Amino acid sequence: MTPYFMEYYGNPSGHYEYGETSKKAIEQVRRTIADSLGAQPEEIYFTAGGTESDNWALHGMADFHPGGHIITTQIEHHAILHTCEYLEKKGMRVTYLPVDEKGMISLDQLEDAICEETCMISVMFANNEIGTIQPIDDIGKIATKYNICFHTDAVQAYMHLRINVHDMAISMLSASAHKFGGPKGVGFLYIRKDQPIRAFMHGGSQERHMRSGTENVPGIAGMGKAVELGMKHGKEEAAYVKKLRNDT
């Protein structure tokens, strides 16, 4: 990160040497993240972290489907729950699925909750309090069956569990760098290229006009390095954490 604080302090949108260096750096990170997910670089949008990514996913779909129906769970992160509560005040209808004693949702209850107005399913990949890993593959199949957008808050899962957005039929995915060894204040939202959604911030042309504002180049560079290390050492780290769990 240090070179982008000290030496290459250029605006990625600028048409000068330092700006072009910054632009190349963030585009390389975009490609690295895309490769880690089985996605395309143009499907990765940089944000200020998981909370912003979750808000964008929910608000973006609500703006595109006013008065629509969202399905989520009772044990989501507050970035999802509080946003859903806000959207209910704006006319959206939200179903909060219960969970069992292990924190798992029922796939039957999920499918039963789907109606004609359902525009989005948002289920956390791995819970931030109790560690429950939801059946993401099966949820993706249900979402595909009914042609519904499937968003997952993968803040606790990305770089710790295998994720392939294509194989899992994930439409949108939120991640935050500091959950996998990167800096705070930066993250990303994966948006499948055929997924209609409104822009989150308006202004300049950054992030393909979807999330305007000068990019956090040092933060993005740090996140990219954390992804590289995670891809290289992820299996070793997972085995170590599993051993810690089993030995306690």
Where are each of the predicted segments found?
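Pyridoxal 5′-phosphate
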Residues: M1-T248
